């Protein structure tokens, strides 16, 4: 060995030690979840259909099982497919899976701040504050219930003024829902004809429309390339920035008129927290603006879309609408507004609402998670910071829990004796530590708005019911209802 020389021998020894250490590390960590072999830079783009990601994931799960790895471009993602594996991750190992995975489009829109997209101590502090403050302002209590009942009255009267003429109810619904979150966060509702309010809602609706454009769908695969190209994805980003600017103006106005002795709304409560804890870096004007944006967007789009989709489904199924009418008439009558205390006495109506949320499968991919530390799941090793897709669609469409899941059937949530049946598989708001902070508010809004509408009106389609299509328009983030018109006939 003398001919090799001492430096060469030492180098070989070092390389051998490094290889052994790497092997031991890999052996101790275990194997990572399997998946299709990615192509450098572009990942698994050819195995994934951007217009039907759920179909692609279903096929991959048949080959690789309920936990597998894909690559969006160079980004590695672990996909969880099915109730059991999602429960193991988000509930049984909730702390490890409590991170927020950020897709390129979400990062571009929200900058990793606020409640939805932040991580670590920032997320914990902001979420804790938001839940406490919303609860103090009446979330889940009578104060918020009364606000929704009042807004439902405005909505019913606005519908009544259409005089049975057919129209797309989308704007009416989003205006009403948006006003609830505005009253909580901004301190007051807007008039339905307020120009700033209408412009704001118009941008949100435009963003919904642009979600299924090819440029938007491909942004998560190739963000750097798409950033340099024109297209609707640029409008989507610009609209979000405009909404952000609108909220900043409101925040500034609140700061100028702030009175610590009389907090008016969520923004005032946040400003008060900033004043009390000036050394706390988690409570800043930027985090206030982003958290307010999160509450506004999340508190408007999901609920209004669920209501809009629900009315379309009822147009398709008049027999279901008629049963709801009879139950609401028997329990609530016509002389008072529906209230949350009625829900336990309206099992069929409650079942229909749950089935609407299950059937529409609004966020099939869920909002991405991430592991906050090296983690093992079913003997697979998942490195820290790996993005996780805990899919909701396979849970809400599980044929063992919900027979014939492709069929709209309130019986999925009814016992044989007609009482309401709860299901652990009902996860439209996700599960675990990252469950939607506004779940309680959304449930209340959907119930009170829908029952108020059906208490006062029957739904009349403008075309033959057999031609009504209740399949979704699939976008990059959500399932959306197809455009439709309806006549509201006073009862």
UniProtKB/Swiss-Prot annotation:
Keyword terms of this UniProt record: Endoplasmic reticulum, Heme, Iron, Membrane, Metal-binding, Microsome, Monooxygenase, Oxidoreductase
GO cellular component terms, semicolon-separated: cytoplasm; endoplasmic reticulum membrane; intracellular membrane-bounded organelle
Topological type in the membrane: Peripheral membrane protein
Cofactor: heme
Recorded catalytic activity of this chain's protein: an organic molecule + reduced [NADPH--hemoprotein reductase] + O2 = an alcohol + oxidized [NADPH--hemoprotein reductase] + H2O + H(+)
Enzyme class: oxidoreductase
Cell compartments where the protein resides: Endoplasmic reticulum membrane; Microsome membrane
Tissues showing expression: Expressed in liver.
KW Methyltransferase (keyword) present: no
Family, similarity comment: Belongs to the cytochrome P450 family.
Gene: CYP2H1
Pfam families linked: p450
SUPFAM superfamilies listed in its UniProt record: Cytochrome P450
UniProt-recorded name of the protein: Cytochrome P450 2H1
Summary of the function given for this chain in its UniProt record: Cytochromes P450 are a group of heme-thiolate monooxygenases. In liver microsomes, this enzyme is involved in an NADPH-dependent electron transport pathway. It oxidizes a variety of structurally unrelated compounds, including steroids, fatty acids, and xenobiotics.
Induction conditions: By phenobarbital. Significantly increased expression by estrogen. Rapidly up-regulated within 0.5 hour after extrogen exposure with a peak at 1-4 hours. Expression is significantly decreased below control level after 30 hours.
GO biological process: epoxygenase P450 pathway; response to xenobiotic stimulus; xenobiotic metabolic process
Predominant subcellular localization, coarse grouping: endoplasmic reticulum
EC number of this enzyme: 1.14.14.1
């Amino acid at each position: 060995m003398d001919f090799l020389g001492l430096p060469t021998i030492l180098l070989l020894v070092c390389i051998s030690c490094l290889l052994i250490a790497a092997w031991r590390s890999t052996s101790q960590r275990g194997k990572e979840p399997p998946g299709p072999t990615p192509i450098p830079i572009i990942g698994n783009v050819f195995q994934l259909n951007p217009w039907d990601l759920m179909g692609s994931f279903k096929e991959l799960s048949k080959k690789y099982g309920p936990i597998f790895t894909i690559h969006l471009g160079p980004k590695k993602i672990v996909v969880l497919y099915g109730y059991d594996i999602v429960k193991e991750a988000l509930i049984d190992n909730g702390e490890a899976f409590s991170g927020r995975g950020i897709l390129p489009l979400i990062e571009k829109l929200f900058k990793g701040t606020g409640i939805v997209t932040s991580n670590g101590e920032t997320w914990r502090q902001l979420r804790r504050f938001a839940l406490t403050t919303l609860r103090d302002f009446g979330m889940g209590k009578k104060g918020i219930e009364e606000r929704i009942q009042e807004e439902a009255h405005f909505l019913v009267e606005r519908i009544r003024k259409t005089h049975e003429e057919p129209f797309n109810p989308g704007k009416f619904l989003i205006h009403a829902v948006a006003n609830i979150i505005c009253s909580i966060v901004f301190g007051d509702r807007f008039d339905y004809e307020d120009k700033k309010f209408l412009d704001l809602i118009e941008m949100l609706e435009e963003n919904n429309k642009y979600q299924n454009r090819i440029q938007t769908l491909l942004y998560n695969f190739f963000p750097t390339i798409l950033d340099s190209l024109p297209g609707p994805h640029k409008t989507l980003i610009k609209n979000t920035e405009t909404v952000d600017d609108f909220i900043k103006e409101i925040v500034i106005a609140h700061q100028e008129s702030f009175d610590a002795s009389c907090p008016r709304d969520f923004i005032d409560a946040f400003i008060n927290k900033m004043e009390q804890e000036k050394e706390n870096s988690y409570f800043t004007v930027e985090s206030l603006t982003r958290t307010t944006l999160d509450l506004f967007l999340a508190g408007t789009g999901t609920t209004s879309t669920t209501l809009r989709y629900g009315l379309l489904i009822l147009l398709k199924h008049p027999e279901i609408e008629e049963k709801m009418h009879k139950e609401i008439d028997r329990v609530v009558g016509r002389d008072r507004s529906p209230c949350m205390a009625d829900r336990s006495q309206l099992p069929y109506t409650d079942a229909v609402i749950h089935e609407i949320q299950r059937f529409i499968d609004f966020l099939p991919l869920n909002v991405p998670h991430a592991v906050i530390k090296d983690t093992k799941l079913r003997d697979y090793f998942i490195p820290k910071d790996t993005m996780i897709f805990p899919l909701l669609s396979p849970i809400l469409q599980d044929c063992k829990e919900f027979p014939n899941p492709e069929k709209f059937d309130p019986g999925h949530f009814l016992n044989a004796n007609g009482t309401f049946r709860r299901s652990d598989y009902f996860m439209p708001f996700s599960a675990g530590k990252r469950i939607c902070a506004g779940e309680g508010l959304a449930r209340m809004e959907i119930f009170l708005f829908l029952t108020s509408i059906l208490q006062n009106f029957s739904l009349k389609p403008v075309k033959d019911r057999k031609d009504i299509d209740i399949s979704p328009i699939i976008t990059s983030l959500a399932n959306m209802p197809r455009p439709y018109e309806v006549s509201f006939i006073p009862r």
